[in-house]
A protein has these predicted regions:
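A short acidic/small-residue loop/turn micro-motif
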Residues: 133-135
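N-terminal intrinsically disordered, cationic/polar leader segments
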Residues: 1-114, 118-120, 124-126, 138-141
Length: 141
């Protein structure tokens, strides 16, 4: 059975002039030709529950899957507008992502993934996002 390896991630997102940087512990594992990185989202407040995010990094496609209090799925493939969804205790909606850039550079369990996309909620443009995900295998793993 393959081992989950501890990694550190740095997630940098830019949207509407706002920069958000998160540095989080995570775990990574290769399954087939894809790298899976799992981490727990920081809780927004005392009433918020846990949400675990899995990032599936393929050769030319990226998928974000969230489970827990928030459930969502987004898929990113260069030049493609792909469907997704968002569900929380407070709201549900269908969305899609139109990926303008996707750059995947991996070396084993470490690497950088950068992508930009336009988000559509119910087919209405909702915003432009630029994301950078750095993955670094923990020393001594």
């Amino acid at each position: 059975m393959p081992q989950h390896t501890p990694v550190r991630i740095r997630l940098h997102s830019r949207h509407d002039g706002e920069n958000v940087v998160q540095e989080l512990p995570a775990e990574a594992i290769f399954r087939g030709s894809s790298l899976y990185v799992r981490y727990e989202d920081p809780q927004e407040g005392p009433q918020s529950g846990k949400t675990r995010t899995t990032v599936k990094i393929g050769k030319d496609e990226l998928k974000l899957i969230r489970h827990g209090d928030i459930q969502s799925e987004q898929t990113f493939k260069l030049g493609s507008k792909l469907p997704g969804f968002y569900r929380s205790p407070y709201m549900n909606f269908m969305m899609s992502t139109d990926t303008g850039q996707l750059d995947i550079r991996l070396d084993g369990l470490s690497g950088i993934v950068e992508w930009t996309y336009d988000l559509y909620v119910y087919e209405e443009f909702s915003g432009h996002f630029e994301i950078s995900l750095s993955i670094q295998e923990e020393q001594g793993s």
